[in-house]
């Protein structure tokens, strides 16, 4: 069972929500500084930031030992082929985490936040889950972002897309470092191409030279611009 998410509440009237999911072995606390940095700069003051915590589950690449994860991973690394990575993915774990992400979205909707004012995103595993959840989701979101991530269940994701494809026109922002030795840059690039092939009409893929499996200031600045575009301030001034 997951621990409760870390929440950074809006400073002004709450009009939008960003859900940011961490990567394998991390926790929501690992990304809270992102929201605090924006707070210090007077940005996104209408936004509540939610940083969920993955449950402790056995992870195959961790010799079967438990660690925080949104789903099990059997293989990892620069030498992994994209098609090979698709095989033996933890479909049950992925769907379970998608249901959890959907419950977080519903909680925000129950609080009066329109789905068009909700952004779902994450880093690595969290980004992969956000990409999958956004593509297969029942609600039209304001935006979806994934940093250093890849497309999950790419050989069968079509089976999970609702017939009316709510997020067909939703903006998607994908970003990846060229020197990523955990999730190869090619995975991110291929995933962006696949997203377009699935019918997504607003997909941005940014590459960052010399960046490994992490985030950097330029990438975060681009994410900042993306958020400002998809959930602009409603009450005047900066979000």
From Swiss-Prot:
<dbReference type="InterPro" id="IPR003140">
    <property type="entry name" value="PLipase/COase/thioEstase"/>
</dbReference>
<feature type="active site" description="Charge relay system">
    <location>
        <position position="180"/>
    </location>
</feature>
<dbReference type="InterPro" id="IPR029058">
    <property type="entry name" value="AB_hydrolase_fold"/>
</dbReference>
<dbReference type="InterPro" id="IPR050565">
    <property type="entry name" value="LYPA1-2/EST-like"/>
</dbReference>
<dbReference type="GO" id="GO:0006631">
    <property type="term" value="P:fatty acid metabolic process"/>
</dbReference>
<keyword id="KW-0539">Nucleus</keyword>
<comment type="function">
    <text>Hydrolyzes fatty acids from S-acylated cysteine residues in proteins with a strong preference for palmitoylated G-alpha proteins over other acyl substrates. Mediates the deacylation of G-alpha proteins such as GPA1 in vivo, but has weak or no activity toward palmitoylated Ras proteins. Has weak lysophospholipase activity in vitro; however such activity may not exist in vivo.</text>
</comment>
<feature type="active site" description="Charge relay system">
    <location>
        <position position="213"/>
    </location>
</feature>
<keyword id="KW-0443">Lipid metabolism</keyword>
<protein>
    <recommendedName>
        <fullName>Acyl-protein thioesterase 1</fullName>
        <ecNumber>3.1.2.-</ecNumber>
        <ecNumber>3.1.2.22</ecNumber>
    </recommendedName>
</protein>
<keyword id="KW-0276">Fatty acid metabolism</keyword>
<comment type="similarity">
    <text>Belongs to the AB hydrolase superfamily. AB hydrolase 2 family.</text>
</comment>
<keyword id="KW-0963">Cytoplasm</keyword>
<feature type="active site" description="Charge relay system">
    <location>
        <position position="124"/>
    </location>
</feature>
<dbReference type="GO" id="GO:0005737">
    <property type="term" value="C:cytoplasm"/>
</dbReference>
<dbReference type="GO" id="GO:0052689">
    <property type="term" value="F:carboxylic ester hydrolase activity"/>
</dbReference>
<dbReference type="GO" id="GO:0008474">
    <property type="term" value="F:palmitoyl-(protein) hydrolase activity"/>
</dbReference>
<keyword id="KW-0378">Hydrolase</keyword>
<dbReference type="Pfam" id="PF02230">
    <property type="entry name" value="Abhydrolase_2"/>
</dbReference>
<keyword id="KW-0719">Serine esterase</keyword>
<dbReference type="GO" id="GO:0005634">
    <property type="term" value="C:nucleus"/>
</dbReference>
């Amino acid at each position: 069972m997951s621990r409760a998410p870390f929440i950074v509440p809006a400073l002004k009237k709450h009009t939008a929500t960003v859900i940011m999911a961490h990567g394998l072995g991390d926790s929501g606390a690992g990304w809270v500084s992102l929201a605090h940095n924006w707070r210090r700069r007077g940005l996104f003051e209408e936004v509540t930031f939610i940083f969920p915590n993955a449950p402790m589950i056995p992870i195959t690449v961790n010799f079967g030992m438990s660690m925080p994860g949104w789903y099990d991973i059997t293989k990892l690394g620069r030498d992994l082929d994209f098609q090979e990575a698709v095989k033996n993915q933890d479909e049950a774990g992925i769907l379970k985490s998608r249901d959890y992400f959907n419950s977080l979205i519903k909680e925000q909707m129950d609080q009066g936040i329109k789905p068009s004012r909700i952004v779902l995103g994450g880093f690595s595993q969290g980004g992969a889950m956000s990409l999958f959840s956004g593509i297969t989701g029942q609600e039209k979101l304001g935006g979806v972002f994934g940093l250093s991530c890849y497309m999950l269940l790419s050989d069968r994701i079509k089976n999970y897309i609702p017939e009316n494809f709510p997020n067909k026109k939703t903006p998607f922002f994908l970003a990846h470092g060229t020197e990523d030795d955990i999730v190869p840059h090619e995975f991110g690039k291929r995933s962006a191409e696949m997203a377009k092939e699935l019918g997504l009409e607003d997909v941005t893929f940014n590459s960052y030279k010399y960046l490994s499996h992490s985030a950097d200031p330029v990438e975060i600045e681009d994410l900042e611009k993306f958020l400002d575009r998809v959930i602009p301030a409603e009450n005047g001034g900066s979000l």
